[in-house]
């Protein structure tokens, strides 16, 4: 190979190696679509006690944002998460918490959240808080929500419907949609708690 050809190919090789390295770095990042997912929050549990993201440190979390008056997506997602956790061994189940965060703090008081969450079994935490605290938690998880006014003074909440899998250190692992089966969720949970 001539020196001139080598001088022409060297920069192209360096560029290709750099792009491959950048691609590997990008693929390994704990994010979805380039945005980091998860972070600190300060909310209130069903007993009115303050909780933070650190309350769940050492446990894997399935995090879902919704509301108790949700007619379909929220109960379906919570049932799917509960079914997935139910497929785990007792020792694995102890390492997982389902964290249901309301996007409707006006109606979803601590008592309402506790009652609603308990319908889906043990290990389900219903969290609420001030509108500002809910907005902060939603920003950390990149969750969309908005109040939709209806006739007669009633309202519903529009919201993203994604389950976030976080590891025992609170780091983002994966997302699940309504197309994800409880079996597939359980398989991913086993990787995180195993």
Model regions and ranges:
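N-terminal targeting signals for export/organelle localization
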Residues: 1-40, 44
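Short, small/polar residue-rich loop motifs at catalytic or cofactor-binding pockets
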Residues: 36-38, 60, 158-160
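Short, acidic, Ser/Thr-enriched surface-loop or helix-capping motifs
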Residues: 45-46, 167
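Generic structural signal for well-ordered beta-strand positions
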Residues: 51-52, 173
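Short active-site neighborhood of thiol/selenol oxidoreductases, capturing the structured segment around
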Residues: 54-75
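Structural microenvironment flanking redox-active thiols in thiol-disulfide oxidoreductases
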Residues: 76-137
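Thiol/disulfide oxidoreductase modules built on the thioredoxin-like
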Residues: 133-188
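Short, hydrophobic alpha-helical segments
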Residues: 192-194
């Amino acid at each position: 190979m001539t020196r001139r050809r080598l001088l022409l190919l060297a920069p192209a090789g360096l560029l290709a190696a750099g792009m491959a390295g950048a691609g590997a770095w990008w693929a390994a990042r704990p994010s979805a679509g380039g945005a980091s997912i998860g972070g600190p929050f300060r909310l209130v549990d069903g007993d009115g006690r303050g909780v933070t993201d650190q309350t769940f440190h050492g446990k894997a979390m399935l995090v879902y944002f919704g509301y108790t008056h949700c007619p379909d997506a929220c109960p379906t997602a919570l049932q799917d998460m509960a079914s997935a956790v139910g497929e785990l061994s007792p020792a694995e189940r102890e390492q997982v918490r389902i964290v249901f965060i309301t996007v409707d703090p006006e109606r979803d008081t601590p008592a309402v959240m506790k009652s609603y969450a308990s319908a889906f079994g043990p290990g389900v935490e219903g969290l609420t808080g001030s509108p500002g605290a809910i907005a902060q938690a939603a920003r950390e998880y990149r969750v969309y929500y908005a109040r939709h006014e209806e006739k007669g003074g009633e309202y519903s909440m529009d919201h993203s419907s994604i389950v976030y899998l976080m590891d025992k250190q609170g780091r983002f692992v994966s997302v699940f949609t309504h197309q994800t089966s409880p079996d597939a969720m359980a398989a991913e949970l086993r990787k995180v708690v195993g």
